[in-house]
């Protein structure tokens, strides 16, 4: 008789306990078919988390198959803890992005902190030392006190974990829209570097080899966290606060260093982070990859308190834990290492040849499941989408007040400087950061070399809602341009797909179309997808977020010497590369004036992106350019203002465009500053101005003139978010 009081198999079926765990009637019946019997309480819980949307991608797997995943530089693609890409000299870059949206909505500090901790462990589990962190965040508008609280908590959580563990946060992006009220998006990315011969895989093989648990003792925090992340947020979600994990960055630091030492041991067979679904996913996935079985003796698992049941142990998402498989007879070597780092560890099982996932506690069997169906045979749902009949009529922008529009956009939190927030992050711990958070991608030197890794993270929402297919192309191209802007060669990307409920036809269609656009852009821009994450059911009280695919992209700089004087100077000439058209669908101007997305859209020419990108990258590396800025949110006038304010330089510009086109967000444009005495030879580059040593920012068109003090612009741009967060109702 079990020492733990749990529902019987009959109660699970009759009272439909499995539904509370997230399994549908059909999924429960499939579990019964796989087992040839009704599952017990622990087995039901295990299937529920492994077949959750968060772990199985059961609604998104068909779309993910569209993405190109191989390429010249790819060493390891999707399927492991993170992607691995060659950077030459027997070195590789390891990177991935993950979401922690639902936990951050309920407990913003811990939700964000554990999101950072989890993505760090994904990188470390491959054997790489992390070199930088990035994040992509979405919140509701800041005139709402709840959104202010969420923003403050998330930023504090990101900084609190990253700063303590000693990894710089070097880049990110934050946008604000009422569609994220109560449902923030917190996507964390980590980048690491490794030598080829140290790359690890999450595999369990070799009959008789031992399974070692290391890290924090298992508690009851985070139970069913993967299931919680696969549901819509409702008024009852607050009661699921225990589903939010608790992070400990100081233990995280110890675990990181111990793991990086453990990978140097030849006796290590495989290693995986205990992330979503905790011990269940890490152990069963390792067994599946190794084509093996596992027997875990759960009484050996280090626990925080007595009485924790097998069900709770297997579903707990206690943070700062790793699972290792080591060669039999060499266990003590690893246990001694972990003891040296003051970490709890234990041998909790062994690899078998049964192809079954067996869990016992004091010799009583609590689960006996075939490995392959559990890990690889979750149901895949192909639903029906519904093409929306978009209104594509043109809005009227002919009578806008340029000055008023300029200042309203400049101080909107989406466009305003994020330094007030980023200053809470340690940006240079480790002393290898070359370009910090600001106007373009971050650049971090590869220690001991003259190489550097450029990284960026970018998301699109209004554009994707505007036209999912074109928006999907745009988000990949935006990341590509940001790497080009620092002279890097884009190598590969990771993605996080943040959407509402796929069971709604319109949202399912958004997934179909946007991933098709992303895949096309990846193919043409030669940026294969090597890792990623899907976060669905981002809805609050029945209202979906905007479809928000996020792309993290890395690039290689073979020699950083050209960055020594890569900063705009007085006397540099400004050029605009790329045509400016009447493109306002999904823009900040459209939001400011009309509020709703009108669905007028442009078609992105990906081939021209490559041509412009190569020309600009060459000009940077030849030392012709002192700065490159992509034209983004708010359009050309806002881009020029940010350039002027960020560097404290005067600017004088004359541009032959209309008033509205000052705020057009036509894709594929760059503003470049050419060093004094240098000549730029790029097709269709138009000289538009000069950087000066005055405090004057002056932009003239045939129809208007803006003339303001740079210091005033800087004060408004840099102070806007702080003002929003300190304003009382």
UniProtKB/Swiss-Prot annotation:
<keyword id="KW-0460">Magnesium</keyword>
<dbReference type="GO" id="GO:0006189">
    <property type="term" value="P:'de novo' IMP biosynthetic process"/>
</dbReference>
<keyword id="KW-0436">Ligase</keyword>
<keyword id="KW-0963">Cytoplasm</keyword>
<feature type="binding site">
    <location>
        <position position="122"/>
    </location>
    <ligand>
        <name>Mg(2+) 2</name>
    </ligand>
</feature>
<comment type="pathway">
    <text>Purine metabolism; IMP biosynthesis via de novo pathway; 5-amino-1-(5-phospho-D-ribosyl)imidazole from N(2)-formyl-N(1)-(5-phospho-D-ribosyl)glycinamide: step 1/2.</text>
</comment>
<feature type="binding site">
    <location>
        <position position="121"/>
    </location>
    <ligand>
        <name>substrate</name>
    </ligand>
</feature>
<dbReference type="Pfam" id="PF00586">
    <property type="entry name" value="AIRS"/>
</dbReference>
<dbReference type="Pfam" id="PF02769">
    <property type="entry name" value="AIRS_C"/>
</dbReference>
<feature type="binding site">
    <location>
        <position position="98"/>
    </location>
    <ligand>
        <name>Mg(2+) 1</name>
    </ligand>
</feature>
<feature type="binding site">
    <location>
        <position position="535"/>
    </location>
    <ligand>
        <name>substrate</name>
    </ligand>
</feature>
<comment type="similarity">
    <text>Belongs to the FGAMS family.</text>
</comment>
<dbReference type="InterPro" id="IPR010918">
    <property type="entry name" value="PurM-like_C_dom"/>
</dbReference>
<keyword id="KW-0479">Metal-binding</keyword>
<feature type="active site">
    <location>
        <position position="54"/>
    </location>
</feature>
<feature type="binding site">
    <location>
        <position position="495"/>
    </location>
    <ligand>
        <name>ATP</name>
    </ligand>
</feature>
<dbReference type="Pfam" id="PF18072">
    <property type="entry name" value="FGAR-AT_linker"/>
</dbReference>
<dbReference type="GO" id="GO:0000287">
    <property type="term" value="F:magnesium ion binding"/>
</dbReference>
<feature type="binding site">
    <location>
        <position position="532"/>
    </location>
    <ligand>
        <name>ATP</name>
    </ligand>
</feature>
<protein>
    <recommendedName>
        <fullName>Phosphoribosylformylglycinamidine synthase subunit PurL</fullName>
        <ecNumber>6.3.5.3</ecNumber>
    </recommendedName>
</protein>
<dbReference type="GO" id="GO:0005737">
    <property type="term" value="C:cytoplasm"/>
</dbReference>
<feature type="binding site">
    <location>
        <position position="57"/>
    </location>
    <ligand>
        <name>ATP</name>
    </ligand>
</feature>
<dbReference type="GO" id="GO:0004642">
    <property type="term" value="F:phosphoribosylformylglycinamidine synthase activity"/>
</dbReference>
<dbReference type="InterPro" id="IPR036921">
    <property type="entry name" value="PurM-like_N_sf"/>
</dbReference>
<feature type="binding site">
    <location>
        <position position="96"/>
    </location>
    <ligand>
        <name>ATP</name>
    </ligand>
</feature>
<dbReference type="InterPro" id="IPR010074">
    <property type="entry name" value="PRibForGlyAmidine_synth_PurL"/>
</dbReference>
<comment type="subunit">
    <text>Monomer. Part of the FGAM synthase complex composed of 1 PurL, 1 PurQ and 2 PurS subunits.</text>
</comment>
<comment type="function">
    <text>Part of the phosphoribosylformylglycinamidine synthase complex involved in the purines biosynthetic pathway. Catalyzes the ATP-dependent conversion of formylglycinamide ribonucleotide (FGAR) and glutamine to yield formylglycinamidine ribonucleotide (FGAM) and glutamate. The FGAM synthase complex is composed of three subunits. PurQ produces an ammonia molecule by converting glutamine to glutamate. PurL transfers the ammonia molecule to FGAR to form FGAM in an ATP-dependent manner.</text>
</comment>
<keyword id="KW-0658">Purine biosynthesis</keyword>
<feature type="binding site">
    <location>
        <begin position="99"/>
        <end position="102"/>
    </location>
    <ligand>
        <name>substrate</name>
    </ligand>
</feature>
<dbReference type="InterPro" id="IPR036676">
    <property type="entry name" value="PurM-like_C_sf"/>
</dbReference>
<feature type="binding site">
    <location>
        <position position="245"/>
    </location>
    <ligand>
        <name>substrate</name>
    </ligand>
</feature>
<keyword id="KW-0067">ATP-binding</keyword>
<dbReference type="InterPro" id="IPR016188">
    <property type="entry name" value="PurM-like_N"/>
</dbReference>
<dbReference type="GO" id="GO:0005524">
    <property type="term" value="F:ATP binding"/>
</dbReference>
<dbReference type="InterPro" id="IPR041609">
    <property type="entry name" value="PurL_linker"/>
</dbReference>
<feature type="binding site">
    <location>
        <position position="533"/>
    </location>
    <ligand>
        <name>Mg(2+) 1</name>
    </ligand>
</feature>
<keyword id="KW-0547">Nucleotide-binding</keyword>
<feature type="binding site">
    <location>
        <begin position="317"/>
        <end position="319"/>
    </location>
    <ligand>
        <name>substrate</name>
    </ligand>
</feature>
<feature type="binding site">
    <location>
        <position position="273"/>
    </location>
    <ligand>
        <name>Mg(2+) 2</name>
    </ligand>
</feature>
<feature type="active site" description="Proton acceptor">
    <location>
        <position position="100"/>
    </location>
</feature>
